[in-house]
Regions:
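Non-heme Fe(II)/2-oxoglutarate
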Residues: 1-78, 97, 123, 199-212, ...
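Short proline/glycine-enriched turn/loop segments at secondary-structure junctions
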Residues: 7, 99-100, 172-176
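Short edge beta-strand segments in beta-sheet-rich domains
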Residues: 14, 82, 121, 178-182
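A short glycine-rich, His/Asp/Glu-containing loop-to-beta-strand
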Residues: 81-89
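Catalytic core of non-heme Fe(II) oxygenases with the double-stranded beta-helix
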Residues: 89-162, 189-201
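Catalytic core of Fe(II)/2-oxoglutarate
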Residues: 143-222
């Protein structure tokens, strides 16, 4: 008879990864192409939403970090790329924060902190995606990872935070005396994934497809 032991199963958890980058990224401190935190949802095209294309070595460092957890933690044998990426600035005081939001058209998202931060720099706060699945409001005597409806992380230099893009998050009020800088990014799968009628191949949309079927050459407009 197998040994019987009580277990805790963190089923269907939304994992947030707190990683550190062993790479000199001080060049980002000289880049002034910021998007203000409060304006990230502005509906306008901006080449600065692909800022990591200006830093291909750094882009690959972040991508390697994500690929490692995708393969080792989630057992995903897929290719990924960084789609959008942008520098953010959050000013001190009133208005120095962003509203809760999440990222569409993205699988995972990330934030990298490349500056030295004050103790009261605005934290990144994550909200539970299960908010509307609970009918009771019961307040615990001590909050922890198992009972919290939100969780905060304070920025640290060289810290990379990766999380599912569906997680609502925000920058809390920045109470420091100097601007708070970060680099945000989104990850998407590329290549072929899915199955049957839910199959997607991103090559279909880039012109990387087979030649026209000769059977179709006889079709003509009626």
């Amino acid at each position: 008879m197998p040994e019987q032991q009580d277990r805790f199963l963190p089923l269907f958890a939304s994992h947030v990864f707190q990683l550190y980058v062993d790479y000199d990224t001080d060049a980002l401190l000289q880049d002034k192409r910021w998007i203000f935190s409060a304006n990230q949802d502005m509906k306008r095209p901006d080449e600065n939403y692909r800022i990591l294309e200006k830093y291909p070595i750094l882009r690959d460092v972040f991508l390697d970090k994500f690929n490692k957890l995708a393969k080792e933690f989630y057992a995903l044998d897929h290719e990924f790329m960084i789609s959008t990426s942008w520098l953010t600035i959050t000013e001190p005081g009133e208005g120095g924060q962003s509203q809760h939001h999440f990222h569409k058209n993205s699988f995972f998202s990330g934030v990298y902190y490349y500056d030295d931060y004050e103790e009261d720099a605005g934290e990144i706060e994550f909200m539970t995606p299960l908010e509307y699945h609970s009918d009771f409001y019961l307040e615990p005597v001590d909050y922890n990872l198992n009972n919290s409806s939100s969780w905060r992380l304070s920025p640290q230099k060289n810290m990379l935070v990766l999380f599912p893009s569906y997680l609502k998050h925000k920058v809390n009020e920045h109470k420091g005396t100097k601007p708070r800088y970060s680099l945000a990014m989104n990850f998407i799968p590329v290549g072929e994934y899915g199955t049957s009628d839910s199959t997607v191949n991103t090559g279909w949309y880039s012109g990387d497809t087979d030649k026209e079927d000769p059977l179709l050459q006889g079709f003509r407009k009626i």
